[in-house]
Design a protein with these regions (language model features):
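Conserved, well-structured functional cores that handle cations and Mg-NTP chemistry
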Residues: 1-127, 132-135
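An anionic, glycine-rich sequence signature occurring as long contiguous blocks
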Residues: 152-200
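Generic secondary-structure signature for well-ordered alpha-helical cores
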Residues: 39, 116, 145, 167-171
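Aromatic side chains
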Residues: 42, 46-49, 147, 165, ...
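Alpha-helical structural signal in soluble globular domains
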Residues: 117, 135-143, 161, 165
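A short alpha/beta connector and helix-capping loop motif
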Residues: 80-84, 134-153
Length: 200
C-alpha cells in the first residue's frame, strides 16, 4: 500500500520518466512484482545502487549503525516472525543493506555476512552488545572500516576483564568526558575515557 501511495504522490515526476496511461500501479500489482523478484539478485542491485549514492555524497567519516530487527506482523500460526539485520548510514539517512537471518539466534552470522558485502572505508560501524565479537571486528577491519562495539554483561568474562582494565584507567590521570541526558523517564549519566592500549 505504501508503494502505491508513493507512486500517486510522485505521479507527475514518474510520468516524465515512464508512460503511465492507466495511472500508477495498484498495491496488488506491486505485490505481484515483488513476489516474482529474486531476493538475492534484488539485494545485489540494491547494494550497488546505494553504493553509487554514497560515492556521489561529499566525503566524510560515515557512522554506520548495524542492528537486528523483528518484522512486526510477520508471525503467523506456523512460522516465527521474520528477523532481519540492517546497516544504516545515520548521517545520510540511507539503508546500505538488509539481510534476513535464519531465525532467532543467527543474528551474529547474518551481521558478519552483511558487513562483508559493504565498502566500509572511511566508516565507523556501531553494533549492539550481541555483536561484540572478535570475528565481527575482523570483518569490519578487513573491509576497511573502524568500529565501536557495545559490551555488556552478556559476555561476563570479557566484561569483567574490561571493567578491571577501565578501573585502572579511571584512576590514572587520563582525561575523561561526562554527559547527562534526560529521556524515556530517566536521567542517564555517561562517562567516557579513551585509551589506545588494546593489549588488555
Amino acid at each position: 500500500v505504501d508503494m502505491e501511495e508513493l507512486a500517486y504522490d510522485w505521479e507527475p515526476w514518474f510520468k516524465e520518466l515512464i508512460p503511465m496511461t492507466g495511472g500508477p500501479p495498484s498495491h496488488d500489482t506491486f505485490n505481484r512484482v515483488f513476489q516474482l523478484m529474486n531476493p538475492t539478485l534484488f539485494e545485489t542491485c540494491f547494494r550497488a545502487w546505494t553504493e553509487q549514492i554514497r560515492k556521489a555524497l561529499p566525503e566524510s567519516v560515515e557512522i554506520i549503525a548495524v542492528d537486528g530487527k523483528c518484522c512486526c506482523g510477520s508471525r503467523n500460526g506456523v512460522n516465527s516472525p521474520i528477523e532481519v539485520v540492517n546497516a544504516w548510514a545515520s548521517e545520510n539517512r540511507l539503508i546500505l543493506g538488509v539481510l534476513a537471518t535464519e531465525g532467532k539466534g543467527h543474528e551474529i552470522k547474518a551481521v558478519q555476512d552483511l558487513l562483508k558485502g559493504l565498502v566500509l572505508s572511511k566508516s565507523v560501524v556501531t553494533t549492539d552488545a550481541l555483536n561484540c565479537q572478535r570475528e565481527t571486528a575482523a570483518v569490519i577491519v578487513d573491509s576497511g572500516g573502524d568500529y565501536v562495539l557495545a559490551l555488556k554483561r552478556n559476555q561476563p568474562l570479557m566484561h569483567q576483564e574490561f571493567k578491571l582494565f577501565l578501573d585502572e584507567i579511571c584512576q590514572s590521570a587520563l582525561p575523561g568526558v561526562e554527559t547527562a541526558d534526560k529521556g524515556h523517564g530517566r536521567i542517564e549519566t555517561r562517562r567516557y575515557w579513551q585509551s589506545e592500549d588494546i593489549g588488555w
